[in-house]
Amino acid sequence: MENFFNNILETGSIIASPSKDPDYNFHWVRDSAIVMKSVITLFEKERKNQKYMKIIENYIKTECEHINFHPAEPKFLLDKTPYLGDWGRPQNDGPALRGIVCLKLLKVYGRKQKDLLKIIFNDLSYTIEQLEEPCFDLWEEEYGYHLYTRMVQYKFLCECLYSDKVQYEDLNERIVNRSRELLGHHFSGDNIYSSYDIHGQILRECDSSVLLGLSHVDYKLDEFDCFSDNIKNYAYKMISVFTDIYPINKKLNIPFLGRYFNDKYFDGNPWIISTIALYQYSFVCPNFYYNKNEFKNFLKFLYDDKKLLLSEQIHRETGEDVSVEKLTWNYSELITLFKFIKNFQIDNLIDLFVTE
């Protein structure tokens, strides 16, 4: 876990990766919230662990500074000022994810309540205001309406409405119900549309952001069924589509997933976070695909690299590392995966990931 904690700086910034080529040495609001979600998982197991407490304190302090800028600013420099270059803005999943994490800290941490509420109210106000507006997706490429963004927004609004610690007069059941209706715009019969543009044109097929979104809301979206047949079928379709285009899948007998079908970034290779999201879903969803041998192959593939550098992508033919290494988001999703595993003989593997 040294690589994971090295990316969480004492200043409170959480870098996406130490890589400078391409340059991921920034604090993304989205990525940092996802990372903090896994830190909270570790903290709940060891509530007296000073390292986890310090990380939490630093994160709260840093986000209190970040909210002085535009709420949907996607990434920050390490001096805690926004990155001002050309980028996909706004990214409305960031405030919702940060709000979800701060709500969780409000429940389990017991300190910095005033600062946490300051962040929550900032993100809640923005989420309500922008609920029906288009934005860029979590892959930072397409402008429109996105299922992932709407899942985390709905989760955030629900949790705020039903929290006895959050009293916000502009939030009511009508807004939460509207948020749920907007989720429904991404489903038509057996079809799931992860993203569509402002003209209603479908932007993506076989998008792993759907599985990541389910994980990031803990598979709990009020009355929304995270384990419906159409979501399971969507996941099965992704396995089939990516196995057809990635030779490495058949070579290693591992169902690697990419970000989405026809991805062009670094030639569209398998992504570690996408594949982990599939296995997370496998462990929590009743009667869904799970192949024990394939899962062991996946763990072996990760552990063959004793330094656990965990690159963002792997080459679709050779399995070699592609793009940045030591992607913080990778380690975070692994911690979440191991949280979901039950009755599986990998205690030694879990210990390796969650201890130094």
Labelled PLM ranges:
Residues 12-21, 74-89, 128-144, 185-196, ...:
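Acidic/His metal-coordination segments adjacent to aromatic residues that form catalytic metal sites
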Residues 29, 65-84, 147-154, 166-276:
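Extended ligand-binding clefts on enzyme/binding-domain cores
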Residues 29-89:
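Membrane helical hairpin/interfacial module
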Residues 41-60, 104-121, 160-177, 218-236, ...:
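Structural helix-adjacent loops and short alpha-helical linkers that scaffold large soluble proteins
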Residues 114-182:
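Aromatic- and glycine-enriched pocket-lining scaffold segments that form the walls
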